[in-house]
């Protein structure tokens, strides 16, 4: 394959990748696909990678319309790129109108991106089968309950667009669990165990029954009543479900259904002393709520095995269990307990701190719920483990917010450029949006005694040397004459953009000092970039997204004449 032919091939792949992911191609994804589909190029991988990087840089400078137009000139995307995804696979045994699913979070904090997967998958299947989605708050561990989480979960689901048909809170259902426990004891499917916990573990690990297992139901019911009336202290008695004592999974053997917790529950106070474990309450509720399908991660397979014993002992029909692969979310804090500790210690500012992966943090950054939903549905319901792609999420979000995001200039760690030799003011008219007729914004370079001033981005200033020609976007060309510590001095060179191109000039954004407003941008690592934004940004409302040209998209958090505070979304 000749060099030009290779470059044309790479360009097509880059255009297709950009069209698919919000107007920006990913060089790694382009390279991977080329190597997969053109094995003959593998010996030239180094050369191909160099070409990929060059071409991707070119494509990523194009507008969405330019990308679409060039793809159409090439005959449109290839079939494998253009065809629709197969979507979610059918649920086993599902009948339209007779599907009941549940989303069952623990109220230890608000929802994060991992919760979103379960919520979206259940919601999507409920919609597809005209079914019912139950929200069940699983709060039977008094030590893992945050009272504020109940409302936060509801708010997060509403923002995510998840439709809830029925709502239940397990701490309101304790008496029901007691009734089922008594029935289980009557049927001799469970027993009260008063063994020392360490001794029980020793017996369990070697596959032997403890002495308590042989108690008759009358004695078990008496001991159960003593558990309820406070005769026993925490750790002295539990209710165990009968299983095979030598079950291959030691975690399943004689698992605990009820235990004593001597701590007040944030919602019920000290009313209850005996609490069901998650596995017992879940099994009971899945039956009583007529759940037909349980969608859960593979890491819950052991829980499924445990819960089935309750169904078997009580003669209940089991739901269909569908276990999907584990979703790895790299570079993000998901643990609500870890986040809570960080909030309490002052490390994090709150549940929406940009360093954590809660839905609140993503919302604060300007991530659309639709982008989250699409990214989750792309992963689908597969038993293969997957890694959550932040790049795919950002690409989808970019595609959604780009049309509604006005453009402005923001210079970080600004360096002042003094432009000598300017005889008259230059009025720069810039579009609010490059592809849509949204009006314009105006910046003015106004000389005083022949000297105009402009603030440049610190990174751009670092690349300028004496003798360089730099173009201030939509304004003038300036020749750099002197580079100082934190300042530049230049001389007016020309107006025409074509001259700048001939000179190989660096093209930079800029802000006039007298038309600037202080601006801070909170980055994903919690750091803050400070500088000045053009004053035109003050016309925007807090909560809107904008693009700081040549930098990134942000969500405006505070907008006033005193300054702007924004939160980084993505490039």
UniProtKB/Swiss-Prot annotation:
SUPFAM superfamilies assigned: Nucleotidylyl transferase (SSF52374), Ribosomal protein L25-like (SSF50715)
Role this protein plays: Catalyzes the attachment of glutamate to tRNA(Glu) in a two-step reaction: glutamate is first activated by ATP to form Glu-AMP and then transferred to the acceptor end of tRNA(Glu).
EC number of the protein: 6.1.1.17
A cellular component term, taken from the record's GO annotations: protein-containing complex
InterPro entries referenced in this protein's UniProt entry, alphabetically: aa-tRNA-synth_I_CS, Gln/Glu-tRNA_Ligase, Glu-tRNA-synth_arc/euk, Glu/Gln-tRNA-synth, Glu/Gln-tRNA-synth_Ib_cat-dom, Glu/Gln-tRNA-synth_Ib_codon-bd, Rbsml_bL25/Gln-tRNA_synth_N, Ribosomal_bL25/Gln-tRNA_synth
One family name in Pfam for this protein: tRNA-synt_1c_C
Molecular function via GO: ATP binding; glutamate-tRNA ligase activity
Cellular localization per UniProt: Cytoplasm
GO biological process: amide biosynthetic process; glutamyl-tRNA aminoacylation
Key words, A-Z: Aminoacyl-tRNA synthetase, ATP-binding, Cytoplasm, Ligase, Nucleotide-binding, Protein biosynthesis
Top-level class of the enzyme under EC nomenclature: ligase
Family: Belongs to the class-I aminoacyl-tRNA synthetase family. Glutamate--tRNA ligase type 2 subfamily.
Stretch list, region Disordered: 75-98
The reaction(s) this protein catalyses: tRNA(Glu) + L-glutamate + ATP = L-glutamyl-tRNA(Glu) + AMP + diphosphate
Cross-referenced PROSITE patterns: AA_TRNA_LIGASE_I
Official protein name in the record: Glutamate--tRNA ligase
The encoding gene: gltX
Motif ('HIGH' region): 105-115
Highest taxon of the lineage: Archaea
Basic and acidic residues composition bias: residue spans: 75-88
């Amino acid at each position: 394959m000749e060099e030009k032919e290779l470059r044309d091939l790479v360009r097509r792949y880059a255009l297709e990748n950009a069209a698919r992911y919000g107007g920006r191609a990913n060089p790694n994804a382009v390279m991977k696909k080329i190597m997969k589909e053109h094995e003959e190029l593998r010996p030239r991988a180094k050369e191909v990678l160099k070409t990929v990087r060059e071409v991707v840089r070119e494509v990523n400078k194009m507008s969405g319309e330019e990308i679409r137009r060039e793809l159409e000139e090439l005959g449109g995307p290839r079939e494998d790129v253009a065809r629709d995804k197969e979507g979610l696979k059918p649920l086993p045994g599902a009948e339209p109108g007779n599907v009941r699913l549940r989303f069952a979070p623990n109220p230890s904090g608000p929802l994060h991106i991992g919760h979103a997967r379960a919520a979206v998958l259940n919601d999507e299947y409920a919609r597809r089968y005209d079914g019912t989605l139950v929200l069940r708050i699983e709060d039977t561990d008094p030590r893992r309950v945050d009272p504020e989480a109940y409302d936060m979960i509801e708010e997060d689901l509403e923002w995510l667009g998840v439709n809830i048909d029925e709502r239940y809170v397990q701490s309101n259902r304790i008496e029901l669990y007691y009734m089922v426990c008594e029935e289980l004891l009557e049927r001799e499917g469970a027993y009260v165990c008063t063994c020392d916990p360490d001794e029980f573990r020793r017996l369990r690990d070697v596959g032997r029954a403890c002495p308590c297992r042989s108690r008759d139901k009358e004695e078990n019911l008496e001991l159960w009543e003593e558990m309820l009336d406070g005769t026993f202290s925490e750790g002295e008695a539990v209710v165990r479900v009968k299983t095979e004592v030598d079950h291959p999974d030691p975690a399943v053997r004689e698992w605990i259904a009820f235990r004593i917790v001597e701590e007040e529950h944030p919602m019920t106070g000290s009313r209850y002393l005996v609490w069901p474990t998650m596995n017992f309450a879940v099994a009971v509720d899945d039956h009583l709520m007529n759940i037909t399908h349980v969608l859960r991660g593979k890491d819950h397979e052991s829980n499924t095995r445990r819960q089935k014993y309750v169904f078997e002992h009580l003669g209940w029909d089991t739901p269909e269990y569908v276990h999907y692969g584990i979703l790895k979310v790299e570079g993000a804090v998901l643990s609500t307990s870890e986040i809570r500790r960080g909030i309490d210690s002052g490390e994090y500012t709150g549940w929406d701190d940009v360093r954590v992966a809660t839905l609140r943090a993503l919302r604060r950054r300007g991530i659309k719920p639709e982008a989250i939903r699409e990214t989750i549905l792309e992963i689908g319901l597969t038993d293969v483990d997957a890694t959550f792609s932040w790049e795919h999420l950002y690409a989808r979000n970019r595609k959604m917010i780009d049309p509604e995001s006005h453009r402005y200039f923001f210079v970080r760690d600004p360096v002042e450029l003094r432009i000598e030799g300017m005889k008259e003011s230059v009025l720069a008219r810039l579009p609010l949006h490059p592809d849509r007729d949204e009006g314009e914004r105006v910046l003015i370079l106004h000389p005083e005694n022949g000297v105009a001033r402009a603030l440049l981005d610190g990174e751009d200033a670092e690349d300028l040397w004496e003798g360089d020609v730099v173009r201030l976007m939509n304004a003038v060309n300036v020749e750099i004459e002197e580079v100082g510590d934190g300042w530049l001095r230049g001389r007016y060179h020309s107006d025409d953009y074509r001259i700048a191109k001939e000179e190989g000039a660096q093209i930079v954004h800029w802000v006039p000092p007298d038309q600037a407003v202080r601006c801070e941008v909170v980055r994903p690592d919690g750091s803050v970039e400070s500088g000045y934004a053009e004053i035109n940004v003050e016309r925007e409302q807090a909560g809107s997204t904008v693009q700081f040209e040549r930098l990134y998209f942000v969500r405006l958090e505070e907008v006033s004449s005193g300054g702007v505070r924004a939160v980084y979304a993505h490039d």
